[in-house]
C-alpha cells in the first residue's frame, strides 16, 4: 500500500505519479502489476491509522523527523482484509467498494518521482453502488478524496491528515 501523487484514468489506462523513494515504486518496478483500491468516505480513519508508516525499512530524513515508522504489514495494522488478485499477483482490499487490477506498461522517471502507465485488466465493484451491471450509481458512491492533506468526499470535509498542521504554521 502506498500513496500516489496523482492518478488519472484514461480509457483502459490509469496514469499515476509516485515517489521514487517509496516501497510502492520499488514494488511496481519488480512486480509489474498494481491494484488500485478505491475507498469510500467511511475509510478515512483506517487510512490515517497507517499514514505514518512506510513499507521501506530505510527511511529518508524527512520521514524520520516526522515520526514515521516501518511497517511490514499495513494490512494487519489497518485491519484490512486481503483478497487475492484474479488477473494479477497483487492483492485487493475487501473493504474498498471499487478495486482495479492493472499491469504496468511504462515507467518514466523524473528527478524524484515516476510517471507510471498501467493497463486495466479487471475491475471489481460492490453491487450496492451499481446503477446497472456497467454503471456506478453516483448518488450511492461517496469516494474518499485526499485533497491537500484533507480527507473529503464529493461534497463534505471529513477530517484533516496529521500533516495538515504543517501548512497552517507556514
Language-model segments: what does each one mean?
Residues 1-170:
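Basic, polyanion-binding surface patches
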Amino acid at each position: 500500500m502506498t500513496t500516489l501523487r496523482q492518478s488519472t484514468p484514461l480509457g483502459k489506462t490509469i496514469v499515476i505519479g509516485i515517489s521514487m523513494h517509496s516501497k510502492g515504486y520499488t514494488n511496481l518496478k519488480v512486480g509489474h502489476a498494481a491494484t488500485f483500491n478505491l475507498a469510500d468516505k467511511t475509510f478515512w480513519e483506517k487510512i490515517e491509522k497507517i499514514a505514518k508508516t512506510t513499507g521501506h525499512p530505510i527511511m529518508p530524513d524527512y520521514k524520520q523527523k516526522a515520526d514515521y515508522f516501518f511497517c511490514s504489514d499495513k494490512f494487519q495494522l489497518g485491519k484490512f482484509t486481503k483478497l487475492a488478485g484474479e488477473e494479477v499477483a497483487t492483492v485487493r482490499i475487501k473493504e474498498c467498494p471499487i478495486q482495479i487490477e492493472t499491469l504496468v506498461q511504462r515507467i518514466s522517471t523524473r528527478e524524484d518521482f515516476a510517471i507510471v502507465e498501467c493497463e486495466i485488466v479487471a475491475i471489481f465493484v460492490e453491487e450496492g453502488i451499481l446503477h446497472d451491471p456497467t454503471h456506478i450509481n453516483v448518488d450511492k458512491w461517496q469516494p474518499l478524496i485526499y485533497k491537500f492533506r484533507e480527507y473529503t468526499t464529493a461534497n463534505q470535509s471529513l477530517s484533516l491528515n496529521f500533516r495538515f498542521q504543517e501548512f497552517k504554521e507556514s
